[in-house]
């Protein structure tokens, strides 16, 4: 579970910072939830949780539900938020985020 890696308190703080529509900022979220400071292996574990279909990539539909991985009652990201998140993370332009791209995004 994601709470094995990140504290429930930090997750709650991160989620409350993005409650409002169109308020999602991945840099702020990764910092507030504590993921930005985690070692590579723990970031990889979070990637594996986000990669719901185990394809080795986080695709757009998985990104849209990103917040729900942290708390099932969290909102879905809007189309604009999802596209901006994907654009920020997809450095090779293949339309999805691989594990190395995710590591770079978390640390950006």
Curated annotation (Swiss-Prot):
The role this protein plays is: In muscle, parvalbumin is thought to be involved in relaxation after contraction. It binds two calcium ions.
Under Gene Ontology molecular function, one entry of this record is: calcium ion binding
Q: Which family does it belong to?
A: Belongs to the parvalbumin family.
Does the record bear Nucleotide-binding in its keywords? no
One Pfam entry for this protein is EF-hand_7
The answer on whether this UniProt entry bears the keyword Transport reads no
SUPFAM superfamilies, per the entry = EF-hand
Q: What is the lineage of its organism?
A: Eukaryota, Metazoa, Chordata, Craniata, Vertebrata
What highest taxon heads this organism's lineage?
Answer: Eukaryota
What organism is listed for this UniProt entry? Answer: Amphiuma means
What protein name applies here?
Parvalbumin beta
Question: Which key words tag this protein in UniProt?
Answer: Calcium, Metal-binding, Muscle protein, Repeat
Q: Which stretches make up the EF-hand domain?
A: 38-73, 77-108
The residues the record assigns to binding Ca(2+) 2 are 90, 92, 94, 96, 101
GO cellular component terms, alphabetically, are: cytoplasm
